[in-house]
UniProtKB/Swiss-Prot annotation:
Residues 1-12 form the signal peptide. This is Potassium channel toxin alpha-KTx 7.1. It is found in: Secreted. Keywords: Disulfide bond, Ion channel impairing toxin, Neurotoxin, Potassium channel impairing toxin, Secreted, Signal, Toxin, Voltage-gated potassium channel impairing toxin. Has the structural arrangement of an alpha-helix connected to a beta-sheet by disulfide bonds (CSalpha/beta).
Length: 47
């Protein structure tokens, strides 16, 4: 399907203003290497 596997469990997501804040968090909490800052919350994804 090629859809991106987003992970944003509300208990694990953190607020952000910049995706750079999300990368270490995502790697630690989810193991996912990529991140975006959407609606001031980190979204973690695998590809």
């Amino acid at each position: 399907r090629g859809s991106v596997d987003y992970k944003d469990d509300d208990d694990k997501t953190i607020s952000c203003t910049n995706p750079k804040q999300c990368y270490p968090h995502c790697k630690k909490e989810t193991g996912y290497p990529n991140a975006k800052c959407m609606n001031r919350k980190c979204k973690c994804f695998g590809r």
